[in-house]
């Protein structure tokens, strides 16, 4: 596995947000992150990940902070570590037809549905709730702070 750059060592996401939710009774916490910009850059994709309460995988970072070889090296470890994960897509045609906001929502719903489990809480990277449904929490720079969002960010880019 490639060694992480020194600048990444201090920026490890953790399970603090997830632990708070688990302690409050939310057993299934899903982290989501999106990649892509629709018709001018291909499909829009949203990753969803459920991480275990009792095990960690080290070297997970916000995927934007990892080089492509680092992301590729982490992919199998992250995929095997997650209790569940999925990626949902909205095609460039759906992005054109629905608009980017609705296409992002569609891709998120597809990813969450593909998990095969009903989430108690969904953590979203960013400041906009593109999932909807009331059981969501938007976290600015969530991929740098929440381990489930960081896992989703790695899985969606593979």
Where do the language-model regions lie?
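RNase H-like, Mg2+-dependent phosphodiesterase core
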Residues: 1-158
